[in-house]
């Protein structure tokens, strides 16, 4: 199965990282892909795979430039933990508000079933989305422009 991009934008980072502490995943290692959305990108965010929303966790914070790495830990953000319906693996999506964006909109609920590409929310202008996953081959590249719900990020 494939993971599609959760956001329109530019891939700025692909690295191995520990999971978000807010979801008690700091002892697990994931592949993290960061997608920066500039003011001209569509800011609707989509589910990278079919699955069930297991957890949503909102964290207030600062409004630093979202292209900075520290924004994923300091800025206002919203976490989604999705259990992939095929692999059973957890996929984490993090919406990160930026310097201009001061509003994160969540459009799903815990326990909701999603199809790949379904709308999960949006962020207002100049923000970032991180996706964390395991056990997949990375298909995307740093510097690549991606489209939410369409561009392939990773595969089994």
Segments (PLM) and residue ranges:
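Contiguous, well-folded functional domains in the mature portion of proteins
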Residues: 1-156
């Amino acid at each position: 199965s494939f993971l599609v991009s959760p956001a329109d934008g530019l891939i700025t980072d692909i690295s191995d990282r520990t999971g978000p502490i807010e979801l008690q995943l700091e002892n697990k290692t994931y592949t993290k892909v960061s997608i920066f959305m500039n003011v001209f990108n569509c800011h609707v965010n989509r589910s990278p795979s079919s699955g069930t929303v297991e957890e949503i966790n909102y964290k207030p914070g600062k409004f630093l430039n979202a292209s900075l790495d520290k924004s994923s830990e300091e800025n206002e953000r919203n976490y989604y933990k999705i259990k992939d319906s095929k692999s059973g693996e957890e996929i984490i999506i993090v919406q990160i508000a930026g310097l201009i964006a001061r509003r994160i909109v969540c459009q799903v609920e815990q326990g909701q079933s999603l199809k790949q590409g379904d709308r999960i929310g949006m962020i207002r202008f100049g923000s970032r989305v991180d996706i964390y996953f395991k056990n997949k081959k990375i298909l995307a590249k740093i510097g690549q422009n991606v489209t939410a719900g369409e561009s392939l990020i990773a595969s089994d």
